[in-house]
């Protein structure tokens, strides 16, 4: 998960909200006149996130991403007051195949117990050498369940993600074993250059 620190709200989004005023509703998020603003928001976040999905940390083109409400705008957990709040936005991946859908598509209108807006979000996870993400740092059974629910809600251990992480870990271990000098520098460079750059730092061996 990317620990997301938002920059300034795009001017276009601020202007749209001001223009609509009291008439603004969550339906406007899908309205034709908001799509240009949404594209600006998506492009900005895509760059901010280093072209990675906020949840699975895989790299995607901007057209393979959607603007995600971290706290849902509709449904039983709706927080419509945050529908046009920039700090409630992230971009997450889009999968056409329903079997491989993860992240925002799988989360839908549910509430995450661990959100990417927390700087310490990844401290709740550990990554094993098989590529599985597991709960960590929990104080009791309830907290462990909350962490596991977040992992499951986002589908972070779906086979295709787990296998891709495993391959990346194997490459990292190879570098560690093959390198005698500048090991820290080389492993840092490897982690920063690819997918899973944050969760890889939670690897336990």
Swiss-Prot record:
Domain of life the protein comes from: Bacteria
UniProt keyword terms in alphabetical order: Antiviral defense, Endonuclease, Hydrolase, Nuclease
The keyword Nuclease belongs to this UniProt entry's keyword annotation: yes
GO MF: endonuclease activity
Keyword Hydrolase: yes
InterPro entries on file: HNH78-like (IPR013467), HNH_nuc (IPR003615)
GO biological process, one term: defense response to virus
Purpose: Putative HNH endonuclease component of antiviral defense system retron Vc95, composed of a non-coding RNA (ncRNA), a reverse transcriptase (RT), a probable ATP-binding protein and this protein. Expression of retron Vc95 confers protection against bacteriophages T2, T4 and T6. At multiplicity of infection (MOI) of 0.02 cultures slow growth when infected with T4 but do not collapse, at MOI 2 cultures enter growth stasis.
Protein name as annotated: Retron Vc95 putative HNH endonuclease
Organism: Vibrio cholerae serotype O1 biovar El Tor
């Amino acid at each position: 998960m990317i620990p997301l620190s938002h920059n300034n709200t795009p001017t276009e989004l601020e202007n749209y909200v001001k223009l609509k005023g009291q008439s603004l509703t969550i339906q406007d998020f899908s309205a034709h006149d908001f799509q240009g603003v949404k594209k600006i928001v998506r492009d900005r976040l895509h760059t901010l996130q280093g072209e990675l999905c906020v949840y699975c940390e895989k790299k995607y083109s901007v057209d393979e991403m959607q603007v995600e409400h971290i706290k849902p705008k509709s449904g039983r957990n709706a927080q419509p007051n945050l529908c046009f709040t920039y700090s409630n936005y992230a971009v997450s991946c889009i999968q056409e195949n329903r079997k491989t859908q993860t992240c925002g598509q799988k989360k839908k209108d549910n509430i995450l117990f661990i959100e990417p807006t927390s700087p310490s979000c990844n401290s709740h996870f550990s990554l094993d050498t098989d590529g599985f993400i597991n709960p960590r740092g929990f104080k009791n059974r309830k907290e462990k369940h909350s962490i596991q629910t977040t992992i499951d809600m986002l589908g972070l251990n779906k086979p295709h993600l787990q296998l891709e992480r495993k391959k990346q870990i194997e490459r990292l271990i190879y570098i560690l074993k093959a390198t005698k000098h500048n090991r820290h520098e080389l492993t840092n460079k490897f982690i920063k250059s690819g997918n899973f750059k944050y969760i890889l730092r939670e690897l336990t061996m």
